[in-house]
């Protein structure tokens, strides 16, 4: 697990609304509403669904539950400290927050976001309810048991948008196979946490996990990487759905005509 605690930084840390007040457009409390408004135009966070969280060292900024994502303000943001969370308490109601908005509830996605931060050292995690993500899980489901646990696609240029893995350098290449595990949905989002963590353990190089008939979680080292990987993945999901309509396979054999360079 990455180590985030810094005693000196904690002593100098602002409190209350000072945690979410800044003129900097790239401050997490300003960036999350801006990103969610963009995601809403893409159909990723329709009807208050989905969410986004950004980690700044030990501090985690989280979009609330039940808010219309295109109308979110910086004052709607929750803030917590990773180091102050009890690892034995993984339920939403057992979390402690440094700053809470007065009229919302904590996001049910919170423990899943924290899994990306603590297990992957991610700087940002995005959860979407993209229709393309849901359709891909349905297409996998239709293939039957044993063939519905991972989405695989290769020989597509957009695959280059993904890193090779947390402990590896460089990005995937055109001829590489991108693999995204699929987990089953649960009635309550926070109950997905253990299954997401199991998928992370089984697929240590993945930057995303699909949730059947629900959506996808995507993370990255920073906001830029999480956002571009989420965009690339949605592109590939849409492409995969259209390929299936045309009877085209997601896994293909394409001759390599030039050397692979890192």
Swiss-Prot record:
EC number: 4.2.1.109
Gene assigned in the entry: MDE1
Protein known as: Methylthioribulose-1-phosphate dehydratase
Function in brief: Catalyzes the dehydration of methylthioribulose-1-phosphate (MTRu-1-P) into 2,3-diketo-5-methylthiopentyl-1-phosphate (DK-MTP-1-P).
GO biological process: L-methionine salvage from methylthioadenosine
Native source species: Fusarium vanettenii (strain ATCC MYA-4622 / CBS 123669 / FGSC 9596 / NRRL 45880 / 77-13-4)
Region of interest called Disordered, as start-end residue ranges on this chain: 1-24
InterPro entries associated with the record: Aldolase_II/adducin_N (IPR001303), Aldolase_II/adducin_N_sf (IPR036409), MethylthioRu-1-P_deHdtase_MtnB (IPR017714), Salvage_MtnB_euk (IPR027514)
Binding site for substrate: 109
Catalysed reactions, as listed in the record: 5-(methylsulfanyl)-D-ribulose 1-phosphate = 5-methylsulfanyl-2,3-dioxopentyl phosphate + H2O
Lineage: Eukaryota, Fungi, Dikarya, Ascomycota, Pezizomycotina
Residue positions binding Zn(2+): 127, 129, 214
Involved pathway(s): Amino-acid biosynthesis; L-methionine biosynthesis via salvage pathway; L-methionine from S-methyl-5-thio-alpha-D-ribose 1-phosphate: step 2/6
Location in the cell: Cytoplasm
Co-factor remark: Binds 1 zinc ion per subunit.
Enzyme active site: 157
